[in-house]
UniProtKB/Swiss-Prot annotation:
It comes from Ureaplasma parvum serovar 3 (strain ATCC 700970). Keywords: Ribonucleoprotein, Ribosomal protein. This is Small ribosomal subunit protein uS2. HAMAP family: Ribosomal_uS2_B (MF_00291_B). Gene3D superfamilies: Glucose-6-phosphate isomerase like protein, domain 1, Helix hairpin bin. PROSITE patterns: RIBOSOMAL_S2_2 (PS00963). Residues 302-334 are annotated as: Disordered. PANTHER family: 30S RIBOSOMAL PROTEIN S2 PROKARYOTIC AND ORGANELLAR, SMALL RIBOSOMAL SUBUNIT PROTEIN US2M. GO terms for cellular component: cytosolic small ribosomal subunit. Belongs to the universal ribosomal protein uS2 family.
């Protein structure tokens, strides 16, 4: 066997992701896409190849699951989960994403088989909160999308009192007993219930502590992890390059700043519970054509600013006609305005 056949070759991808693979064949396989480049390494890795395909590599790369944060923000403890450094970002080893996702998937199925309960936690971003709520409701799990209240797990006795008060108010508002209260008292009860709904709406039916926590951002919600570790509650977390893997029991190295990648990973984890109960899955076992990722829009669009809103500054608008568009006026030349003002001044004199 020649030295050329045993040499390690580098495969360059379109998305600036470099994948190293060892080829023993004489014919060199050239990838045509980032997913194909990664697939070459998957075929050479028996550990990855024998795993159940939860989500395709094409969808993972399409969602940007491999894109890490700026190296300035990284945690050195995540070095073993980082494949390379490209431009201003680290590149997450997507093969380890697949490997650890399968590990978390199987663990969740074991918990569900034993009748365990799951709590989804994510308090960053409106879209992520809505996604967490949807997946939790789909699997009859608990969820926390507002600020993590200290003692949610460690001081469950006090939390149980608040939950009891919340459920009592809900039952009161739905019954005819509420009519016995004065209007002022009804308003006070509604305000109290709305406040409790904000923080306890996702755990109102929780009778005991959950058996597993699933976190979207272990850095932002580190207090939830600290409480879980005190009680030996396993934690599954989507970890970017700034996370501390030593705090996480079942880590999934992935881009948790992308709504698309969060949608994929949370969908797979929720499918592990849904599949066990005979419910239809959203990601697992479905072709890529049936998996719809959310469309993301840029946060900064100058032409979408409304001049009637507070803080509007015309100097940040690219074209002068943009301002007139919101006022339903046609653009008027500045020289015409000067002529009109001069005529008005002459008439007043």
């Amino acid at each position: 066997m020649s030295q050329m056949e045993n040499s390690t070759k580098k495969v360059e991808s379109v998305a600036n992701v470099e994948v190293v693979t060892t080829e023993n064949a004489k014919v060199e396989q050239k990838p045509t896409s980032p997913a194909d480049a990664i697939q070459l390494k998957v075929n050479a890795n028996s550990t990855i190849k024998n795993l159940k395909t939860l989500v395709s590599i094409v969808k993972l790369t399409e969602s940007g699951a491999h894109i890490g944060l700026n190296p300035k923000k990284w945690n050195p403890k995540m070095a073993s989960y980082i494949h390379a450094k490209r431009s201003n970002n680290h590149v997450i080893d997507i093969l380890k994403t697949i490997l650890f996702l399968d590990r978390a998937y199987k663990f969740l199925q074991e918990v569900s088989q034993n009748g365990g309960t799951v709590m989804f936690v994510g308090t960053r971003g409106r879209v992520v909160k809505e996604l967490i709520k949807a997946e939790a409701e789909r699997t009859n799990s608990f969820y926390v999308t507002q600020r993590w209240l200290g003692g949610t797990l460690t001081n469950f006795t006090n939390i149980s009192r608040s939950l009891k008060k919340f459920n009592s108010n809900l039952a009161l508002l739905e019954s005819e007993e509420i009519n016995k209260y004065s209007k002022k008292e009804q308003i006070a009860i509604n305000k109290e219930t709305a406040k409790l709904e904000k923080f306890y709406g996702g755990i109102k039916n929780m009778k005991q502590r959950p058996d597993v926590l699933i976190l979207v951002d272990p850095v932002n919600d580190v207090n939830a992890i600290k409480e879980a570790r005190k009680l030996n509650i396993p934690v599954i977390a989507l970890a970017n390059t700034n996370a501390d893997p030593q705090l996480i029991d079942y880590i999934i190295p992935v881009n948790n700043y992308s709504v698309k990648s969060i949608t994929l990973i949370l969908g797979v984890l929720a499918d592990s519970i849904a599949e066990l109960h005979g419910e239809p899955t959203k990601i697992v076992g479905r072709p890529d054509s049936e998996i719809v990722l959310p469309e993301t829009k840029s946060n900064w669009k100058q032409n979408n600013y409304d001049p009637s809103k507070r803080g509007y500054n015309p100097k940040y608008v690219n074209h002068k006609s943009t301002f007139n568009k919101f006022n339903n006026k046609k653009p008027v030349d500045s020289t015409t305005n000067e002529i009109k003002t001069n005529v008005i001044k002459a008439e007043t004199k």
